[in-house]
Regions:
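Structured-RNA-binding interfaces characteristic of tRNA pseudouridine synthases
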Residues: 2-274
């Protein structure tokens, strides 16, 4: 790859590189860059700009909050034709050397000029993990919410159908971020399951939607837990949604239990780099 020698130059950007990123969000003030804060986007920008030796525009599929993790976050970066010559192997090795150990680029794709990790996403999927038992989770503790009391999963599952479809999710949005902005979203899937991580049984809540509001998934989880604790019945979920009022919903669940699991794109748009 022939990298630009002048960091201040403006090259002709004829294509897009797309990176699939995983990270442990525990040490970061969220994904989005913030002055004076350590963020996932800031670390990615520093690493990619070091390799390309120029400033970049970086777009993500979804901005995760402080403490939230990702298995398959996607970012897009406009590049030159010459920069496309950098091989997949070189990208992965360089990013492994340049990124902190809690952030990894797991795959590199090329895409058309103008492709956006955010605006070309068809849907995004999150999973929230809960350890609802007396015993403290040990090896999985950084990625689950330890809820010491057992939850009625059947009751919580009965509330999930109310979440499906396109509707106003303002009740689950951080108040300040909803001012003057649209709060309608479409949820395609909301379901509970179980998994075993490091020998520990984990309750999972997976939700897929076209997009999500600030703190939306965590507030939905907090509301479902109220139902799982028998403080409310499953029909309450419908009342919360219809209220369009943050005070009507349950508390926001801790960030540590939430993981951004993936993004759905048109499969013809992304081609794995050679």
């Amino acid at each position: 790859m022939t990298a630009p020698s002048d960091f201040n130059s403006t090259p002709e950007l004829d294509a897009t590189l797309v990176f699939r990123v995983a990270y442990d969000g525990s040490s970061y003030s969220g994904f989005a860059e913030q002055p004076g804060q350590t963020t996932v986007a800031g670390e990615l920008r520093r690493a990619i700009e070091t390799l390309l030796r120029r400033p970049i525009d970086l777009t993500c599929a979804g901005r995760t909050d402080a403490g939230v993790h990702a298995v398959a976050q996607y970012i897009s970066v406009p590049v030159t034709d010459a920069e496309l010559a950098c091989t997949r192997r070189r990208w992965l090795r360089a990013m492994d050397a340049l990124l902190p150990k809690d952030i990894a680029i797991n795959e590199v794709y090329r895409a058309r000029k103008g492709f956006s990790a955010r605006f070309d996403a068809r849907s995004r999927t999150y999973t929230y993990r809960i350890a609802d038992r007396d015993a403290r989770p040990v090896l999985s503790r950084g990625a689950v919410w330890w809820h010491r009391y057992p939850l009625d999963v059947d009751a919580m599952a009965a509330a999930c159908p109310a979440l499906l479809g396109e509707q106003d999710f303002k009740s689950f949005c951080k108040v300040a971020s909803a001012v003057g902005k649209p709060t309608h979203r479409c949820v395609m899937r909301a379901e509970f399951g179980h998994e075993v991580a490091f020998g520990e049984d984990i309750l999972t809540f997976t939700i897929e939607g076209n997009a999500f509001l600030h703190s939306m998934v965590r507030t939905i989880v907090g509301t479902l837990v109220e139902i799982g604790m028998h403080r409310r019945d499953p029909e309450w979920m419908r009342e919360v949604i219809d209220a369009c009022d943050r005070t009507a919903a349950g508390p926001t669940a801790p960030a540590c239990g939430l993981t951004f699991m993936g993004v759905n794109y048109d499969p013809t748009e992304l081609v794995v780099l050679d």
